[in-house]
Amino acid sequence: MMKAFFIAGTDTDVGKTVASKAILHALAAKDLRTIGYKPVAAGSDKTPEGWRNSDALHLQKAATVAVDYEDINPYALELPASPHIAAKHEKVEIDYAVLSRKLAQHKENADVVLVEGAGGWRVPVSDTDSLSTWVKQEDLPVVLVVGIKLGCLSHALLTAEVIKADGLNLVGWVANRVNPGTEHYAEIIDMLEERLEVPKLGEIPYIPSAKRKDLGKYINADVLLEL
């Protein structure tokens, strides 16, 4: 069994890494070999080992297969901005062939590979292209992470619509409560369950420092494994 999924978000800061970690933890509980892959990350810190992005480091730690950082995050861009701006600032060209080569490598070594996106679905990686082009090229099934807050319904439904229009398979979604004060939470979830028309993998409650916690209990990984 080898499965790969792309983790998309309705926007930046909606909890893609939190949801990815939760899914990785749930899969680890089933004794599966997992790898978290962050092809492009904008916003990295200089370390003695080189540039490191905190989200990519969280994925590296949550996975069950040990992988060198450079293979988890081939493009660790310094500037915390849209990837196309950060890449231009550093005079870097994001090469889809590199992303595909790393993905193929991960597929050989894991039962499940989670590929975490950057920003939202149409995030630019150059002046003329978006990361979604590469996702379409790889024909990756998509899991949508919805940060539950005011405005998320429109963002979620629009993103799901575009993913499907791009010819990709939206296989599930995760609710991540990013604001503990969001009103009408249950009603928002009900609407998303009705309108997204794909399985909900789980609901992650608001948890301070969630990226540092074990989140597997909030995810039903069987939905992905049965695909």
From Swiss-Prot:
**Where does it sit, as one GO cellular component term?**
cytosol
Q: Where does ATP bind?
A: 13-18, 55, 116-119, 176-177, 205-207
- Give an example GO molecular function: magnesium ion binding
Q: Which cofactor does it need?
A: Mg(2+)
* Major enzyme class: ligase
Q: What are the binding positions for Mg(2+) in this chain?
A: 17, 55, 116
- Protein EC: 6.3.3.3
Where does this one sit in the cell? Cytoplasm
**Pathway linked to the protein:** Cofactor biosynthesis; biotin biosynthesis; biotin from 7,8-diaminononanoate: step 1/2
The alphabetized UniProt keywords are: ATP-binding, Biotin biosynthesis, Cytoplasm, Ligase, Magnesium, Metal-binding, Nucleotide-binding
Q: Which Pfam families did the record assign?
A: AAA_26
PANTHER family xref list: DETHIOBIOTIN SYNTHETASE
Indicate what this protein is called per its UniProt record. Answer: ATP-dependent dethiobiotin synthetase BioD
> What gene does this protein come from?
bioD
